[in-house]
Amino acid sequence: MMETAADALASGTVPLEMTQTQIFEAIQGDTLLASSLWINIALAGLSILLFVYMGRNLEDPRAQLIFVATLMVPLVSISSYTGLVSGLTVSFLEMPAGHALAGQEVLTPWGRYLTWALSTPMILVALGLLAGSNATKLFTAVTADIGMCVTGLAAALTTSSYLLRWVWYVISCAFFVVVLYVLLAEWAEDAEVAGTAEIFNTLKLLTVVLWLGYPIFWALGAEGLAVLDVAVTSWAYSGMDIVAKYLFAFLLLRWVVDNERTVAGMAAGLGAPLARCAPADD
């Protein structure tokens, strides 16, 4: 039974009557799929320990806030990937007419959207603070990002209409365009003023290039065109998560630790450089 379920998972389909326990056993029976999840749990755990050690001596409030934001990334990931590997946040949905797997129950690891909805805003908070951005731009980026993740989840869970799955996908991509605009235009200018352009541009490019991969693999995976099976898509997502989250957070936190005085001198508040703060009247 377990081998049959594992084979079904590898092909992107599972029988409708599978329980959570059976899904868990089937995931463990698919080496490619299981390894894509367990490796993230392991790396997230190591990242948490490393980041706590790296940020232990930070004293500036802005630097500490960046540290907390970066630390939240692996904390969210380890929770989410544990949910995935246990089968708790994995379901199987019958694909609508028009889908390449129409009528089949397709494995849907919707727990990934929980990861993205909680971790990617933390990445943006850290980047916004690094750029010296104001609260309005930060709020815009974070809310658009959450909208992107929620509508992406809607695309994955919609089974009533194949067309509506793609409508949700387009809406999600529209939110993504807003995030890209803030990153590439608004925050790039802010970072120049703040004097953090070099590290910001490195992290910006890393983020943009990798984040562009997520909608591409969604479209190619079982949730979209079904060109790639579930295990391959899972590894694609996991690989991008490793670089876009753990490596990103490490590079940012290392820079903040080495340049805490620069961070401390950037602003008294979001988007308010110290040099521009007028003294209070006597």
Curated annotation (Swiss-Prot):
It is a multi-pass membrane protein. The chain crosses the membrane at residues 30-55, 62-85, 110-131, 135-158, 162-184, 197-220, 230-258. It comes from the Archaea. It is found in: Cell membrane. One of its GO terms (biological process) is phototransduction. Residues 56-61, 132-134, 185-196, 259-282 are cytoplasmic. Keywords: Cell membrane, Chloride, Chromophore, Ion transport, Membrane, Photoreceptor protein, Receptor, Retinal protein, Sensory transduction, Transmembrane, Transmembrane helix, Transport. Residues 1-29, 86-109, 159-161, 221-229 are extracellular. The modification N6-(retinylidene)lysine is found at K245. GO terms for molecular function: monoatomic ion channel activity; photoreceptor activity. One of its GO terms (cellular component) is plasma membrane. Light-driven chloride pump. Belongs to the archaeal/bacterial/fungal opsin family. This is Halorhodopsin. It comes from Halorubrum sodomense. The gene is hop.
